Amino acid sequence: QVWYGAHAGDHFIYPDCRPEFLSAMNAVAQICHTFPISVEAPFLNYSKAEIVKIGLDLGIDYSKTWTCYEGQDQACGKCGSCNERLEAFALNNTADPLTYQG
């Protein structure tokens, strides 16, 4: 199995995060390998806030997760990914434990 983190908020931004992409990849994966694999996107129909809620309920240590696209030692807090992450935590009335620049 191959798992990836596409979520509902990404459908319109990234073609590889759309349900049609997942279906097509699974069709290709079934015929292209000696041992067929499946491509899984368990959060495809969940918002980022819903994903954060699931993680909080499971006790995930979000200080050990990364969202920023800038590739620095600390998250920038300004890119689209950081903004979505901060909003997801805010919608869950929880402070994001990640340290941000500035």
For the regions a protein language model found, what residue spans apply to each?
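Nucleotide-activated chemistry modules centered on ATP-dependent adenylation/adenylyltransferase
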Residues: Q1-G102
